[in-house]
């Protein structure tokens, strides 16, 4: 017991986890009064099952709460920022800014995936890079901040890490729609997306796509799904022709 070479004790694992959560707190600029909220926000159901924590031991309830908080904050933000935009357009903007790929992108920007607690099998099959898992954890983290620090703290997190640089993010996540409208207005040629490469096992694929106006290639993109790769290609296409 406690000899060199032994597996880490429970206390050592707890200390290691505390150090990781403290690092995340520094990154997001919010320090939890109740650390349990943060730990639970990072706990995926696969880890909870593996550690026999029960159905309530994972982040799904916090995700449910965070989703509602995010909808309110993003709606309030867009209502105040775009005073001349009708309801339908505001709904579209909100949907593009808080959709699964967008939340996953935002989370990766501040390094959330490295802090997630996943079951060994889920981790080995690429779960840490899966948009659905990362975006769900982002909502769970928001829910945890809301419970621990209230609406003001939750709003500050959203404004700093999700709704920051809104023009660039909207351009990126609406790229296919924006490019289609640009091509229809300026060109007589048809916009075409072409799959160039598909690599990797089913659980961790990579796609490369190019977009063309007629026969002329205007952009390429890489992504973990074909749709994501098309968005990246469209973004580069916009940058080239605008």
Regions of interest found by a model, annotated:
Residues 1-242:
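Double-stranded RNA-binding/processing signature
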């Amino acid at each position: 017991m406690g000899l060199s070479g032994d597996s880490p004790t429970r206390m050592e694992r707890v200390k290691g986890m505390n150090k990781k959560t403290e690092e995340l707190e520094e990154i997001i600029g919010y320090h939890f009064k109740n650390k349990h909220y943060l730990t639970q926000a990072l706990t995926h159901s696969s880890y909870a099952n593996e550690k026999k924590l029960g159905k309530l031991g994972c982040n799904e309830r916090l995700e449910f709460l965070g989703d509602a908080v995010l909808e309110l904050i993003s709606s309030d933000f867009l209502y105040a920022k775009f005073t001349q935009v009708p309801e339908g357009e505001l709904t579209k903007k909100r949907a593009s800014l808080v959709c699964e790929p967008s939340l996953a992108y935002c989370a990766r920007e501040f390094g959330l995936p490295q802090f997630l607690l996943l079951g060994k099998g889920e981790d080995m099959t690429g779960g840490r890079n899966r948009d659905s898992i990362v975006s769900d954890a982002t909502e769970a983290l928001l829910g945890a901040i809301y419970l621990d620090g209230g609406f003001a703290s939750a709003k500050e997190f959203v404004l700093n890490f999700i709704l920051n640089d809104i023009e660039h993010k909207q351009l990126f996540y609406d790229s296919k729609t924006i490019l289609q409208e640009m091509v229809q207005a300026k060109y007589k040629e048809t916009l075409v997306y072409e799959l160039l490469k598909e690599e990797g096992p089913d659980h961790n694929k990579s796609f490369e796509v190019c977009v063309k106006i007629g026969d002329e290639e205007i952009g390429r993109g890489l992504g973990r799904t074909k749709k994501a790769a098309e968005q990246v290609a469209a973004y580069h296409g916009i940058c080239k022709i605008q």
